Design a protein with these regions (language model features):
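Acidic-enriched, low-complexity/disordered segments with a strong bias for Aspartate over Glutamate
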Residues: 14, 24, 29-32, 108, ...
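Cys/His-clustered metal-coordination modules, chiefly Zn-binding fingers
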Residues: 174-251
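Generic structural motif recognizing short loop/turn segments at the entrances and edges of beta-strands
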Residues: 5, 9-13, 23, 80-87, ...
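Hydrophobic, aromatic-lined core segments that form the binding pocket/scaffold
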Residues: 39, 47-209
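Generic N-terminal leader/targeting and pre-domain segments
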Residues: 1-58
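Generic short alpha-helical hydrophobic face used as a protein-protein interaction/packing hotspot
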Residues: 26, 67, 156, 222, ...
Length: 251
């Protein structure tokens, strides 16, 4: 992995090596229920969340951005990825991703067919990293799995939308569409689950423009109000329903 790639990941996804930004908590520690509870209680105060469920949802969005978005971006743009195992990952005090020394490696497609390489990379990502993290967040906070997995899907939609808006090279657009279709149509085996937990939430292109709203609410609006009042996400289903109700009243 050259320095240009690492600088891109640092700039776009807040990914740092351990010597650049020390860790606050290793993700392996977060998988311990007692330590996870302690961390969520601290994080809840940091972001001014009213309860553990809101804190867990916000943390899942952040972690998906750091790990999932960066991986999918790398697959499209660089045709390679950082091998982000649970053991390699930690969060800094600033809630950026700290990659621990000696526990990561860059993986190119190399001699493998890209489809075979992609399946191995994404199975490792979702089944051994994302799924365990979401499971412990659910267990500790009782936030529904559907919210957590849609948080992941929203990050996927977002990173692909941004690449399509900026990246015009046909080979990369082809990779993106292929990767999206693979994720959309993957079986539950990719996630070590009975069913694909994100397929109903994935959207790109015209479908995303026509129907941008989420199916579940990430609970962001429950964070402490700022000077502008309650803050809803742009794709918030609650905000959308309120708008529809007002429009019906005006008719």
């Amino acid at each position: 992995m050259n320095s240009n790639v690492m600088n891109k990941l640092k700039t776009n996804f807040d990914i740092y090596l351990e010597h650049e930004m020390p860790k606050d908590i290793a993700i392996t520690d977060l998988l311990d229920e007692e330590k996870c509870l302690s961390f969520l209680q601290k994080y809840m105060q940091e972001i001014k969340a009213p309860n553990l469920s809101v804190a867990a949802s916000m943390l899942s969005k952040r972690y998906a951005y750091l790990v999932v978005s960066s991986t999918l971006y790398s697959m499209v743009v660089f045709n390679g990825v950082l091998n982000l195992s649970v053991k390699a990952c930690a969060l800094t005090k600033e809630r950026k991703l700290c990659i621990q020394a000696g526990m990561y490696k860059w993986q190119d497609v190399k001699s493998l067919e890209r489809e075979e390489w992609r399946e191995k990379v994404l199975h490792h990502l979702f089944s051994t990293n994302i799924k365990p993290v979401l499971n412990i967040l659910k267990k500790t906070s009782h936030v529904p799995s559907s919210i957590l997995w849609e948080n992941v899907a929203i990050r996927i939609n977002s990173v692909y939308r941004k690449i399509l808006a900026e990246e015009l090279e046909p080979v990369k657009i082809k990779r993106l569409n292929s990767d999206f279709n693979f994720l959309k149509n993957a079986s539950g085996d990719l996630f070590n689950l009975k069913e694909n937990p994100i397929k109903h939430y994935l959207k790109i292109g015209e479908e995303l423009k026509l129907n941008p709203c989420r199916q579940t609410c990430c609970l962001n609006y429950k964070l402490e109000e700022n000077a502008k009042g309650i803050v809803y996400c742009n794709n918030c289903p609650i905000k959308s329903n309120q708008t529809k109700a007002r429009n019906q009243c005006d008719e």
